[in-house]
Structure formats: structure tokens, C-alpha cells
Amino acid sequence: MKYDVEYSKTAMNTIKKMDSSTSKLIRTWIEKNLIDTENPRVKGKALTGDLKGLWRYRVGDYRILADIQDDKIVILILDIGHRSKIYL
């Protein structure tokens, strides 16, 4: 089954605030790698500690934090940010 991608309000606001080249890079990566994928875990890495249960995807120096909801067949993008600030 193919997964759909949904964005949280936080993720949408972050994308809108980014410069256009970074925003385009991230949106393109999501379109190519997550939309309609059959296994969203292949490109990501499971997080541990306080963020256990979430997944992260690397796009250059940026990270996409997501919740993979198998029961709904949805990848919920929770937040997007620079690798130095996203986990704070």
C-alpha cells in the first residue's frame, strides 16, 4: 500500500518561512522519496530518547521529523529544520 504525506501546521509554517531554494529542495525530496512510497522507513532513521517513535529524514543540512502512521497509511511531517536546531 502506498503512503500519503500530510503536514502539520508547524511544518507548513516552517516551509513558508524558508528561503525559496531550500523550500524547493525539501518539497522536491518529499515528492520523490515519500509520496506514494510503499516503505517510508527505507529512507529514514528511527529516533530514540524523547523522540522515540518518530522518524527523521536527511535532506542536506536539514532534517524532516515525521510520524509514520501505519494504521492510516500516512506519513505526518511534524517539523522541518536545520540539523543544529531541529532536536532542541
Question: What label would you give each PLM region?
Answer:
Residues 2-5, 9, 13-17, 24, ...:
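Enriched for short, Lys/Arg-rich terminal
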